[in-house]
Amino acid sequence: MSHYLIGDIHGCYSEFKSMLDLINFNLKNDIIWIAGDFIGRGPDSLKVLRLIYKLKRNIFVVLGNHEINLLLLYAKIKKIKEEDKLTEILNAPDLKILISWLRKQPLLKIDKQKKIIMIHAGIIPKWDMSDLITNSKKVECELKSKNYKKFLKFMYIKNNEHKNIWKNNLPEIIKMRLTLNIITRIRYCISETEIDLLHKEHPEKSPNHLIPWFKFKNNITKNYSIVFGHWSSIKDYKTPKNIYGLDTGCCWKGELTALKWDNKLFFKIKSK
């Protein structure tokens, strides 16, 4: 059995299908993990979503910020933007089935035997493995619950009372909002506990006080490799040896990238 890890697809169905052909994807033998943001921005998000749903026994996903965005749109908490390119999904006859499945998907995947963690954006240095699992599970439980719309509404409300600083004594709902932002949106940290959600540029062009989250020492990365997406502008940036960034900007005329974990071989499909 081969284990493949794929970066942000962003609705690029043609490239996704080409990748499955390139790796000779075999339903009997292969497993794929996708690092979130498999919908949004690109031209064929509905096709991508339906294919992943159809192959859900072999293809596993983590939620990214664009999947959370779809849930917010479905719940009518925010208005759709043209650049979202999610109208086709929202008008689909099987929308309820797809949304029901989507909100049951995890924020992270862990393979304890292979020592892999997949997450869409990243983590904060302050967290250990127990923190990561506990905090993500709390958010996942809310997304699965009947009250998920109420939860999402609170996640979306802008609140300046609490800055983006992790403290263990924060109210539980604030910690859940921070957790969701960290896991699906983080790029930079200001310190071991404070995150920046504004800057997206390459580290060489960022303000001096901002440090990529993976540059901090962390207890988790002593024993596990972390595979993530989200940050296409660092596709040529050298990350630590056990940190793998797989977003190579497929929806921005870049590439779709897959990593075969068994032999660390990379596969790439150019954007069409």
From Swiss-Prot:
Whether Hydrolase counts among this entry's keywords is yes
Task: Show the HAMAP family listed in the entry.
Answer: ApaH
State its role.
Hydrolyzes diadenosine 5',5'''-P1,P4-tetraphosphate to yield ADP.
Q: Which family does it belong to?
A: Belongs to the Ap4A hydrolase family.
**Superkingdom assignment:** Bacteria
Q: What is its EC number?
A: 3.6.1.41
Name of the protein this chain belongs to: Bis(5'-nucleosyl)-tetraphosphatase, symmetrical
Disulfide-bond pairs as recorded? none
Q: Which organism is it from?
A: Wigglesworthia glossinidia brevipalpis
Kindly give the Pfam families that the UniProt entry links to this protein.
Metallophos
Reaction catalysed?
P(1),P(4)-bis(5'-adenosyl) tetraphosphate + H2O = 2 ADP + 2 H(+)
Which InterPro entries would you find in this protein's record? ApaH, Calcineurin-like_PHP_ApaH, Metallo-depent_PP-like
Which molecular function terms from Gene Ontology are attached? bis(5'-nucleosyl)-tetraphosphatase (symmetrical) activity
Record key words, sorted? Hydrolase
Coiled coil region boundaries: none
Q: Is Hydrolase one of the keywords?
A: yes
CDD domains in UniProt: MPP_ApaH
Top-level class of the enzyme under EC nomenclature: hydrolase
What is the primary gene name for this protein? apaH
